[in-house]
Swiss-Prot record:
Protein name: Large ribosomal subunit protein uL30
One Gene Ontology cellular component: cytosolic large ribosomal subunit
Cross-referenced Gene3D superfamilies: Ribosomal protein L30, ferredoxin-like fold domain
Single GO molecular function: structural constituent of ribosome
Keywords assigned by UniProt, alphabetized: Ribonucleoprotein, Ribosomal protein
One Pfam family recorded for the sequence: Ribosomal_L30
One of the GO BP terms on file: translation
Assembly description: Part of the 50S ribosomal subunit.
Record SUPFAM superfamilies: Ribosomal protein L30p/L7e
Organism lineage string: Bacteria, Pseudomonadati, Pseudomonadota, Betaproteobacteria, Neisseriales
Organism: Chromobacterium violaceum (strain ATCC 12472 / DSM 30191 / JCM 1249 / CCUG 213 / NBRC 12614 / NCIMB 9131 / NCTC 9757 / MK)
InterPro entries assigned to the protein according to its UniProt record, in alphabetical order: Ribo_uL30_ferredoxin-like_sf (IPR036919), Ribosomal_uL30_bac-type (IPR005996), Ribosomal_uL30_ferredoxin-like (IPR016082)
Similarity field: Belongs to the universal ribosomal protein uL30 family.
Amino acid sequence: MSNAKTVKVTLVKSLIGRLESHKACARGLGLKKIRQTVEVLDTPENRGMINKISYLLKFEG
């Protein structure tokens, strides 16, 4: 994983009251708590989830 492209994603807004599909995207990225940061592979699938809930996230990479 050290040579694969990754993206750092941080959940900055609450999932309370959000659409179930948006909550599922956050869970799919491995995010459970506010201010939790995870590093995910830069794949089209992960990029799609990041784009869908970009208003809840801060990401770099």
